[in-house]
Amino acid sequence: MSTADLMRRWVIALLLAAAGVAAEDSCSRNEFQCRDGKCIASKWVCDGSPECPDGSDESPETCMSVTCQSNQFSCGGRVSRCIPDSWRCDGQVDCENDSDEQGCPPKTCSQDDFRCQDGKCISPQFVCDGDRDCLDGSDEAHCQATTCGPAHFRCNSSICIPSLWACDGDVDCVDGSDEWPQNCQGRDTASKGVSSPCSSLEFHCGSSECIHRSWVCDGEADCKDKSDEEHCAVATCRPDEFQCADGSCIHGSRQCDREHDCKDMSDELGCVNVTQCDGPNKFKCHSGECISLDKVCDSARDCQDWSDEPIKECKTNECLDNNGGCSHICKDLKIGSECLCPSGFRLVDLHRCEDIDECQEPDTCSQLCVNLEGSYKCECQAGFHMDPHTRVCKAVGSIGYLLFTNRHEVRKMTLDRSEYTSLLPNLKNVVALDTEVTNNRIYWSDLSQKKIYSALMDQAPNLSYDTIISEDLHAPDGLAVDWIHRNIYWTDSVPGSVSVADTKGVKRRTLFQEAGSRPRAIVVDPVHGFMYWTDWGTPAKIKKGGLNGVDIHSLVTENIQWPNGITLDLSSGRLYWVDSKLHSISSIDVNGGNRKTILEDENRLAHPFSLAIYEDKVYWTDVINEAIFSANRLTGSDVNLVAENLLSPEDIVLFHKVTQPRGVNWCETTALLPNGGCQYLCLPAPQIGPHSPKFTCACPDGMLLAKDMRSCLTEVDTVLTTQGTSAVRPVVTASATRPPKHSEDLSAPSTPRQPVDTPGLSTVASVTVSHQVQGDMAGRGNEEQPHGMRFLSIFFPIALVALLVLGAVLLWRNWRLKNINSINFDNPVYQKTTEDELHICRSQDGYTYPSRQMVSLEDDVA
């Protein structure tokens, strides 16, 4: 090979290598190339958090060239950032330079609203009503004495209520004066009472609540009027117990154990338990003393055992030898060395650093978390945008608002308090509510009326209400709406049940009922087919189950006493609940793991009742404080007062389109008949795995699913029929197409069945049931045949199959013999026997051998 050819090959190799390097350095269309050649996602450029090692993705030169879209606002300034237009002048600073809240026109109230001195707007109904609805109290500043109309009753506190509510056995005035004997003129109000009495294991508060009897005289008020702590003996601790500063008792072994067991933390005060020297500038001698770090290796003995003056270590820098054995950073100490790790890494085996997966920790990000080497990245779900100033995910679009119950009404308040009105006035005792955002509809339950209602939100003030459920309700404390499949779910604490119905209230079914259960609040996840509810029975718990009533189990059973409200943050996949006994807000993931206590506060969580999640905030109602509070849902910090001077605020929900994401209604989009082919209810099934059914059929109470898994039969009929036809579960998967195996009871009497007319069922469905009943009756008739006939019906098919197999074998043998070259002998005996054996007769049952004859040699010889 010549020198020129060799040089030419070297040039080609170098060009190919350069092209490969260039190809590796180039980034894809959706990526941004840092100055050092690293590629990052384009959406991370100029988001306020540097991802490039050299910081070039957040440099002023890069970000100043960013052009905002038409529906965005440019923050401008040194580093231009883009935010949604809807965040402009919303009362919250989103730009670093506050430019999104500068030059905003003053907010004006509508002609029908009252403007508070702080600029907020409230409904004129709230002015001079005895409650401070403006945070500055300006709505009650210049009010005259309250006068009630002729159709109203004046409470002792000057509040006006409808006359029909007075002396009805249900306390409506804050002071209870509407039920005082002197105001009722001796009328019997006990017979009119609508509140359910407490059980024998519960204590009836003077304020009408029911609490566990074990909570009476426990040193903590649980009743709203604190009647559970009246006339209690002074508590004294046993000799083996420690008395906390608040008077409560704990076991003596829990004092000074480095854990706070007393609520006031007094069990860890004044403890002397030194196991190491305090502060980084202290050195612990091997002999136990603590000396200043400056005295180490100063050629003077300060430790009794001279451990502060080791001759070899004091003059040696261990980091010079193989970096001290450290994988990243080595820090030389006066005695020895120490391995350190950069930010985003942790030290393992004292020498090696490994990346920390921050995304494994709950609530690292408000929504999505992307783990990177040495760091992590927070992202937002669809419908949200990362706030460049606060680094939290904010909803895009119109501002959200709170809907909450206020005893006799449902109120509506925007999050910036620019609007505060009464949405549903003149209610009796509303306790639970939920919404259907797409249809702009609200649902609520009334504890006194024992009914569930519904109304369009833009028509609600006109008293245009629809009664959804009006029968068989006792205490509907919890309510949730499946906005995808158009169903409602509610709890009833008296029978201890969870039920479901369509949003029209035509079809309903009880999904869960358990003695001793006291279900309270409920929340649904129709995207994945699950429901969750709190239960303050004995023992208290949080339960989870499918929206069709299957796979019900407990998620939380420990460190829980009085769980009230519960809510689900779909974006982060976490459940939040309040505990009125523990005065806390806690959260777990939807599988019951990664539990976290968000906030504990006996003052602002005196008696929390319900809560709602939106963006980075948690909102909750408190019936003792008669107020609504908010806090950071990740840290529990930044607690603020949202509304006060309310009348028994209980349920609260957040109304915004991002709280109810879209999903697929498989009951309407399948290839089956409408309603999934179900005769009655079509309920979503829990999506436990990739092969889980999408929905199941369900029947009303007192009826069971038939063998086709879609139509319904009365439970009475199934008892009269055979065990086989009645052993069908009331809720089954829609993917099942074969009826279950069943046994036959020969001794069961033959009883005719009639088609069942069920409310809400069509004529076609009734015909289906009748046809199936006839089929069952035909099957029943066969059971009465003699045992001999049954034996023949089983034996004959088996014999026929055996004959067919035998004939096939003979045909194969015949074919094989015909294709074999054989030698014929003249021996007549041999010839006769072989001819007989090869002679095959064909009968109507197939090929069979003829009866074999016995031939004697003596006969032939003769």
UniProtKB/Swiss-Prot annotation:
Annotated signal peptide: 1-21
Region (Disordered): 730-761
A Pfam entry, by short name: FXa_inhibition
The EGF-like domain, residue ranges: 315-354, 355-394, 663-713
Protein's membrane topology: Single-pass type I membrane protein
GO CC annotation terms, alphabetical: apical part of cell; basolateral plasma membrane; cell surface; clathrin-coated pit; early endosome; endosome; external side of plasma membrane; extracellular space
Alphabetized GO MF terms: amyloid-beta binding; calcium ion binding; identical protein binding; low-density lipoprotein particle binding; low-density lipoprotein particle receptor activity; protease binding; very-low-density lipoprotein particle receptor activity
Subunit structure: Interacts (via NPXY motif) with DAB2 (via PID domain); the interaction is impaired by tyrosine phosphorylation of the NPXY motif. Interacts (via NPXY motif) with LDLRAP1 (via PID domain). Interacts with ARRB1. Interacts with SNX17. Interacts with the full-length immature form of PCSK9 (via C-terminus). Interacts with PGRMC1 and TMEM97; the interaction increases LDL internalization.
The protein's name in its UniProt record: Low-density lipoprotein receptor
Chain's gene name: Ldlr
